[in-house]
Amino acid sequence: MAEQHSTPEQAAAGKSHGGLGGSYKVIVYEMENFQGKRCELTAECPNLTESLLEKVGSIQVESGPWLAFERRAFRGEQYVLEKGDYPRWDAWSNSHHSDSLLSLRPLHIDGPDHKLHLFENPAFGGRKMEIVDDDVPSLWAHGFQDRVASVRAINGTWVGYEFPGYRGRQYVFERGEYRHWNEWDANQPQLQSVRRIRDQKWHKRGVFLSS
């Protein structure tokens, strides 16, 4: 994806590509615990530090969900941000100590239903596991190995994790086909837990909370 040059103010006004108006809103703070300079966004922002903010210390998602990235232009490690408060870096990242968060976009949820197919080999080969309207904290517990080399997201939006219990690097699967693990920006074909990303529009009881 080519880097775009829009400021947080432009994103907040919905001028950048992908603006979704009032249905998505996030407040980004420069310091931990919602202190310091702040920036409100209602659309994608490929470079959070281009204008007002020197860094990102905490986040409040008022409506979403959103997908944040470690680097500019929607690159690097991914972080799913559902409705709620994230007072410091370890509230959105559980894989390593990285307080770098430089780009952000709304995460489209195409409906209340969820279906996901996981495959052992690239190009949808080998063993297959189907998950329907459920969260799976351990693929091993369901008789599947940790090697996942291709994925079909039939319905809904999902997030996969490197380790059991929704730990490690996060990989988002929006509706579509992923023939090889490099298509979800992974370095190896390893997934050990997956869950649904839900929108309060259909799921009024709220969103996922990590233990």
Curated annotation (Swiss-Prot):
Keywords, sorted A to Z: Acetylation, Eye lens protein, Repeat
A GO BP term here is: visual perception
Q: Does the keyword Ligase apply?
A: no
- The modified positions for N-acetylmethionine read 1
Q: Which Pfam families match?
A: Crystall
Location of N-acetylalanine modifications: 2
Stretches for region Connecting peptide: 109-113
Alphabetically, the GO molecular function entries are: structural constituent of eye lens
Q: Using the UniProt annotation, give all residue ranges assigned to the region (N-terminal arm).
A: 2-23
| Signal sequence, start to end | none
Q: Where is the Beta/gamma crystallin 'Greek key' domain?
A: 24-63, 64-108, 114-155, 156-198
* Superkingdom of origin: Eukaryota
Checking SUPFAM superfamilies in the record gives: gamma-Crystallin-like
Q: Which InterPro entries match?
A: Beta/Gamma-Crystallin, Beta/gamma_crystallin, G_crystallin-like
The record's listing under SMART domains reads: XTALbg
The chain's disulfide connectivity reads: none
This protein's assembly is summarised as:
Homo/heterodimer, or complexes of higher-order. The structure of beta-crystallin oligomers seems to be stabilized through interactions between the N-terminal arms.
The Swiss-Prot or TrEMBL note on domains reads: Has a two-domain beta-structure, folded into four very similar Greek key motifs.
What is the documented function of this protein? Crystallins are the dominant structural components of the vertebrate eye lens.
Q: Which family does it belong to?
A: Belongs to the beta/gamma-crystallin family.
Protein known as: Beta-crystallin B3
